[in-house]
Amino acid sequence: MSRREDGRLDDELRPVTITRGFTTHPAGSVLVEFGETRVMCTASVTEGVPRWRKGSGQGWLTAEYAMLPAATHDRSDRESVKGRVGGRTQEISRLVGRSLRACIDLAALGENTIAIDCDVLQADGGTRTAAITGAFVALSDAVTYLGAAGKLSDPRPLSCAIAAVSVGVVDGRVRVDLPYTEDSRAEVDMNVVATDTGTLVEIQGTGEGATFPRSTLDKMLDAAMAACDQLFEIQRAALELPYPGTLPESAEPAKKAFGS
């Protein structure tokens, strides 16, 4: 099998690194790196829920995604300066929120909110999938914090782990984890969000340059699921380390639970 421009095989991920405790203040803070793509993912815990959720006894999880102005080759203005949030930003923010809500029992949170913030420090393709993969680890740390604070009605509110990866058809070949040079010329482009129990959360796929047959879709999903299995192992290894910050003194730190 011939190799890609960066030396990888078609089914090979870029080097993936997950660093917990990247910043001090949030309950969960992670730097996730997929090759040259770097995303800071934080999970902050606040008391209370949105107005439409009050009185339900259930918590909420929301997410925001943004790119720093110099995350790409050409600087872009901050959306706060423009006075509006772009459609792409809204779409990805909602994707991250949906993906993580798929793995957590919101009733176990009580009326507390977990706010996920994903800020792209450097972009080289696959920023949304990197954000989801890193945000799950940040969420896991936030759940550990809530448990130590005695705010969980269920000590294991996470039903599974969540990871995501890009997959596409480039030069007629199915490839996973596309960098920008491949993503920008892919004939088919897809993002897959999966659980460590083998189920799918979301699939976003488009024939960029041409239509594609069902058999290609099946190959892409197989490649993406196999790549996600590797990401789950990386998440698991990161979460085996002790909680990186200071937990509330009222409880003993519990051993980190990974997904299911």
UniProtKB/Swiss-Prot annotation:
EC number: 2.7.7.56
Pfam family, one: RNase_PH
Presence of the UniProt keyword RNA-binding in the record: yes
Molecular function via GO: 3'-5'-RNA exonuclease activity; tRNA binding; tRNA nucleotidyltransferase activity
Coiled coil: none
Keyword tRNA-binding belongs to the record: yes
Keywords: Nucleotidyltransferase, RNA-binding, rRNA processing, Transferase, tRNA processing, tRNA-binding
Any one biological process term the GO annotation gives: rRNA processing
CDD domains found in the cross-reference section: RNase_PH_bact
Alphabetized PROSITE patterns for the sequence: RIBONUCLEASE_PH
Binding residues for phosphate: R88, G126, T127, R128
Family, per entry: Belongs to the RNase PH family.
HAMAP family reported for this sequence: RNase_PH
NCBIfam families (alphabetical): RNasePH (TIGR01966)
Quaternary structure and partners: Homohexameric ring arranged as a trimer of dimers.
Function noted in UniProt: Phosphorolytic 3'-5' exoribonuclease that plays an important role in tRNA 3'-end maturation. Removes nucleotide residues following the 3'-CCA terminus of tRNAs; can also add nucleotides to the ends of RNA molecules by using nucleoside diphosphates as substrates, but this may not be physiologically important. Probably plays a role in initiation of 16S rRNA degradation (leading to ribosome degradation) during starvation.
Protein name: Ribonuclease PH
Source organism (scientific name): Mycolicibacterium gilvum (strain PYR-GCK) (Mycobacterium gilvum (strain PYR-GCK))
Native organism taxonomy: Bacteria, Bacillati, Actinomycetota, Actinomycetes, Mycobacteriales
